[in-house]
Structures are given as structure tokens and as C-alpha cells.
Amino acid sequence: MGSAKSVPVTPARPPPHNKHLARVADPRSPSAGILRTPIQVESSPQPGLPAGEQLEGLKHAQDSDPRSPTLGIARTPMKTSSGDPPSPLVKQLSEVFETEDSKSNLPPEPVLPPEAPLSSELDLPLGTQLSVEEQMPPWNQTEFPSKQVFSKEEARQPTETPVASQSSDKPSRDPETPRSSGSMRNRWKPNSSKVLGRSPLTILQDDNSPGTLTLRQGKRPSPLSENVSELKEGAILGTGRLLKTGGRAWEQGQDHDKENQHFPLVES
């Protein structure tokens, strides 16, 4: 049948070795084999150190935070407020600004009402006050007469309106010029010229515009239609010699009847 010990023909391969995954504990990690930047962890403060040294170590640890995006970049130190006395220019400017602020904070001065008379006017005697009032323009006095004048003019207007309407109905004419038919005709001439203008129904023709259709443009009347009309007139009036050729009536002396000349002529 076969030997008791079976030997595979192809030698077994060793498991695949990846140099990136050699140091990884779990190769199933999604970020396996990606080299990370190592985080520098500061050592914890030792309990044997004094409190002052521990605080300094904490400050140093805060300043050199390994998680800082700008690790190792020298920063410009912040200027702390020192106790040096300010310059004289700064003192002057500060005083000016302080005075302006104090003025703006003050309440506004009370404004006197305009109707209240001034103290100087109150001190004046009655005679001087009257003289001042006389010097002032009498606005009230001028307003009352103007109102009276307007009321009088309004009263006159209704009486004048019927007279004006009567005069407007009649044509205005001078008393010197006599009224005659000739003058009336002359007066109405411009109006008649407007009426006698070109009617909108008439055809607008210019000197260059063709008045009538030429022979080429128009339809030439056929001699047959003329003969039929003449024959109708002759039959009605009973005049004219009618000829019957081939069941059709023709009039003698026509140029287009040359073909029918050999037929016998029958008088009606």
C-alpha cells in the first residue's frame, strides 16, 4: 500500500516575514508598520526633592511640552510690565486724555427755554420795553390786513365770474372793426384749410410714385371679352350684324376671324 511515514514532496515554506511588522505585537492593527514620532514623556517629579525644585520642574515641563506643534522653536518673550517710571511725554498725554474724559462725563448745561424772557429784559423799565416792541416789525398787524384783502378779493371773484363766462361765450372782436361776412370768412379760413386737407382714405401719391399701372404691369383686355360685350349690346338694341360660326357669334371685320372666312356666312 504505502510506507507508514509520508513525506511531502514540496518542502513547507517558512511563514512570511515582514520587516515592518516584525516589531508589531498585533499585525492586525490598521496602522501597523507606520513609524510614529515617539512622544517624549517627562519623568514624574521625585518625592525626595523640595517643593521649590518641584515647581521649577513643573514650569519647565509646561514650557517644553513635547505635544506642542512648535517644539524647539525659540519664542519671543512677552514683555512684562515693569515698574519703571513713564516718560514725561506719556505723562502729558495721559493728563490730556484724563481731562477730556472728565469733561465728557460732566452733565450738559441746562438750556433755558426760549419763551422765558432774558434777565436783561426783565431789568429794563416798561418804557424801554415798549420802545423795543415798536422797533420790532409788526408781523401780526401785517397779517390781519392781508387776510382782509384776500377775503375781499374772494368776494369779488364770484361776481366777476358770470360776466367773464358771458364774455367768453361771444367771440372777442374789436369795436372798431365792423362785423361782416367777409371778415367771418377770413377768420374761418385757417380752420377750413385744416378740414380740407388730405383725407386719410385717399391714396398718398408723390411725384415719383407711379400713378397708374403700366401696360406691362396691367392685364391686357382680351378682344374676345370686348366682342362678347359688344354682341350682348347689339342683341339688346337690335342693331349690328351678327354671324353664327360653329355655334358661336362673331362680329364681322375682326382680325382673329381669318380662319373662319371659308365658312358660309348665315345672316340672322
From Swiss-Prot:
GO terms, biological process: cell division; protein ubiquitination
Keyword tags: Cell cycle, Cell division, Cytoplasm, Mitosis, Phosphoprotein, Ubl conjugation, Ubl conjugation pathway
Coiled coil regions in record: none
Cross-referenced InterPro entries: CDCA3
Modification comment: Ubiquitinated and degraded by the APC/C-Cdh1 complex.
Biased amino acid composition, Polar residues: 128-149, 158-169, 178-194, 205-215
Residue span of motif KEN box: 258-260
GO cellular component, one term: cytosol
Region span, Disordered: 1-232, 247-268
Biased composition (Pro residues): 107-116
Domain of life: Eukaryota
Modification Phosphothreonine occurs at: T37, T76, T202, T212
Presence of keyword Magnesium: no
Subcellular location: Cytoplasm, Cytosol
Modified residues (Phosphoserine): S29, S31, S44, S64, S68, S87, S94, S199, S209
Keyword Transcription: no
Low complexity composition-biased segments: 117-126
Role: F-box-like protein which is required for entry into mitosis. Acts by participating in E3 ligase complexes that mediate the ubiquitination and degradation of WEE1 kinase at G2/M phase.
Quaternary state and interactors: Interacts with SKP1. Part of a SCF (SKP1-cullin-F-box) protein ligase complex.
Protein known as: Cell division cycle-associated protein 3
Gene this chain is encoded by: CDCA3
